[in-house]
């Protein structure tokens, strides 16, 4: 509940998806770096009984449209490796980070793959963030249209 309360602060984006009178998804976005150019997509949660039903896509697209209306240039997010979502699970990213990072492959239907389908790019990693050999990934998307 503290996260939900924080998501409702002025200047944050918080949206739920409702189907048949039940909450089936929630997205929270928040400003970072003074909220002028870059926002964090902090949480996207979708009811596990409705996988691949378009709830996550709809919430994400709504957040992106909201950001575009406010001339926000970048949306970024973190996604974890707790469930073996990529080929880097168990890799020692401290020894030689660039070789494995250059060949990262998502596991089908993983959050990493979902974000790639939504147009988010892999832009960074925190090795061992969730335990030895279990990294956290930084992904981002530009909303800018260059002249």
How would you describe each model-predicted region?
Residues 11-12, 24, 36, 41, ...:
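Short coil/loop residues immediately preceding or within conserved phosphate-binding loops
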Residues 2-3, 58, 62, 110, ...:
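Alpha-helical elements of Rossmann-like donor-binding domains used by nucleotide-donor carbohydrate transfer enzymes
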Residues 37-48, 76-80:
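Conserved acetyl-CoA binding element of GNAT-fold acetyltransferases
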Residues 16, 22-31, 40, 45:
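Conserved beta-strand in the GNAT
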Residues 67-107:
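Conserved GNAT acetyl-CoA-binding A-motif
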Residues 97-147:
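C-terminal "cap" of GNAT-fold acetyltransferases
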Residues 46, 52-65, 76, 91:
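Conserved acetyl-CoA-binding loop-helix of GNAT-fold acetyltransferases
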Residues 1-19, 28:
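Active-site rim helix/loop that mediates acceptor-substrate recognition in acyltransferases
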